[in-house]
Structure formats: structure tokens, C-alpha cells
């Protein structure tokens, strides 16, 4: 599909869909169908990977794969992580348990459609019966794609990619077991059914979303966090930060749209609910107590362990409630990078780390969304350590935005989009790149026009 045709489809969807998130229901990865009941949503469901947490627990992964009946495993990682103790511990465990394996270490930091397809072709030719992902979200998402497309050997890449960029096909094939072992405290991908990548043709991020993509088991070993460089810890931590804030302030599940006629069609991202709130609150409180120490004290196992746990907890929360504007705006930001290369990263290409692209708009976003649910924004600010006594509801957005800025400043985050290489002249392209993200931007508690999106990008040019 050409860029012109895709943008035409996007504009048609935008023009013909209600802007109020309480009456819009195209949240799944698939194309809209006449499958609603005619009544508003009345239920939510929670699903997540099995989680095992503890220092040194990664040594058990070989036994897990043996118990799953695996005989030939594809270990997906990247060129940096493959040299770290996390991979050595896993390989030793596989050897002790008699598990054959091959290592795929070509994962690209911030994957593209091309890099994911490279992994798919590797997996399709090997007849693996299980996958083990070790690394950050890039490795875990790449492993999800390799698992899916090697299980459906006839599928084309865009078949399963979210509409409107892809065809949004529902997953009906049986996937192989996937164990995810995160080495960064950020994406929460070890518990979610989402795989994100840059679609280079449109300079936009998109992904594949399905509960069937969730890893079979998440092995959360805080010892691996001690190898995270300072900047990686900071940027990944802000992904956790925004996962928790966005899921906590997302539209209520009962206001998301019409209930499906078949419960299997209930979307991956359903809106905030009482159970997702538990995970978000835990993550926000943990961030308040540990985030800054985890950045600047790399040997502080307690702080880094707690952030690792917060990442998983926030992942379970947003994996069901969803995220909204910070993530929706982040995708064209990272997709339109020119020459920015973050300090502390050994990437051979320009990139804006996902957590940085997400948090850079957060102050503007939460000032914008606060009028829709000020009590939620005040509670979020309080969970992050702000004093809320005497604060009027009208000031909820300002307080939460200032609280977010405080964390950004302490972490040494760049002062807005200008420092990432953008200017006001880029805003039309950034807005255009946000339009395909309706699947998540509709989960914001306040509807947006294109003018609103332009204003959010403009306010994010400078943060402090």
C-alpha cells in the first residue's frame, strides 16, 4: 500500500469516527467489524504472562524449557546483551538441561519492519519449538514477531500489523512457547501482547497487538539490571513512568465503546479498570521511592530491583488498560529522527530511545488531559510525591506536569523536542504521524482535534 493510499485511509477513518473516546470503539488490532452488541461496554478482563521474580532466577530457564518439552530453542538478543552475564547464565542453564539452541543476536535497538523480518526469516528456516528472549523491549518484541511468523509460515508481514497500516488479521495459529527475560526496567514487554516497530515507509511506529503474543513466562531477575548503563536506566525508567501514568488516567473501560458480541473480540487495550489501577498505583509509588537512586547508584540493587518490579507491574497494568497520548505522540517522534544519538548508547544509527520519545511530551499531555478527570491527575501527582492539599481541581494538570518535569530534570532529560533535532516546521509531519495511532490516542480521557495535537507538539518543543 502506498503512502498516499495509507494517509487517505487514515484521513477517512478520522473523518468518519466520533472523536469522543466514550463513543469510539475501534481499539483492537483488527479492522472494525459489525460485531458489537449495541450496548456500552460493561466488563473488563485481565490477562498477563506468568511472572517469576527473584535475584538469580534466570538460572532456572533451562528447566522451564525442558518442562515445556522444548528440544530446539531460538535465543533472541542483541549484539550488546549477548556479551553480558544474563546470556551466559541462560546458556549455561540450557546446557545443563540438555536443550539445543541457536542464538539470534541481530536484534536492532528500536526495531524496524525490516529488522523484524530478518529475524522472522532466520526463525522460519530452523524449525524451533520454543523461543527465549533476553534483552530490552526490542529483543522481546522481535522474538514475538519471530514466533508469530514462524508459526504462520505463509503470512506476509503486514497481515498481522495493526490497522490502518496493516491488515489487522486476528491470530488463529498456535504459537510456540516464549520465555522473556528482560534486562532493562522499561517496556514491560515481558507481560504484554504487543510488539512495536518502526514502519520505515511512513516514518511511523506501529505494531502487532494480540493477547496470543504474550510470553508464556516472564523471568524477572533483578541481578541483570546492574549492567544497565545510566542513560539506559533513565530512558527505560521513563517508559515505566508513562505506562503507569497513562494507564491510570486512561478512559474508564465502561466508556470505551460498545461491548463486543463475542468476548474473544474484546480488545487488548480496554481502558482503566479497578484491577489495572492496582498495578499502576504500585508502579507510581515505587518510582517515587526508587527511580532517581536507580539512575545514579548503579550498584544499588534494591533500587534497581524495585524499578525492575515496577516495570513488570506497570506492564501488566497498561497491557490491559492501555496507554494514550504520550505513547501516541511518541511514535512519529522516534519515527522522524534525523541525526540524534543518545549518550550512553552504542547504536550505529540515529535513534530516540522509546522512553525519551514518550516522556518528552508528558508535561504537555497531562495538562491537556487533566480537565477530563482532575481527581485522577491529582492522585497521580500525590503518588509521585507532590503535595496536593489545598490544590484546586483546575490546577491538577499543572501540578502533575510540574511533578513530571521535576523527575525529568533530576534525570537529566533533554529540554524538549528542539534538543532532539525538531522545530516547529516539523509539527505537521508529527501530527500526520500521530493519526494512525487512534487505537491508543482514543484511550485518552479527553478527545483531541488535529489542532490539539499541534499544540501538544508545540508545547513540547521546550519542557523546562
From Swiss-Prot:
Its EC number is 1.1.99.24. Pfam families: ADH_Fe_C, Fe-ADH. It is found in: Mitochondrion. InterPro entries: ADH_Fe/GldA, ADH_Fe_C, Alcohol_dehydrogenase_Fe, HOT. The keyword Membrane does not apply. GO terms for molecular function: alcohol dehydrogenase (NAD+) activity; hydroxyacid-oxoacid transhydrogenase activity; metal ion binding. The keyword Oxidoreductase applies. Belongs to the iron-containing alcohol dehydrogenase family. Hydroxyacid-oxoacid transhydrogenase subfamily. PANTHER family: ALCOHOL DEHYDROGENASE, HYDROXYACID-OXOACID TRANSHYDROGENASE, MITOCHONDRIAL. This is Probable hydroxyacid-oxoacid transhydrogenase, mitochondrial. It comes from Drosophila melanogaster (Fruit fly).
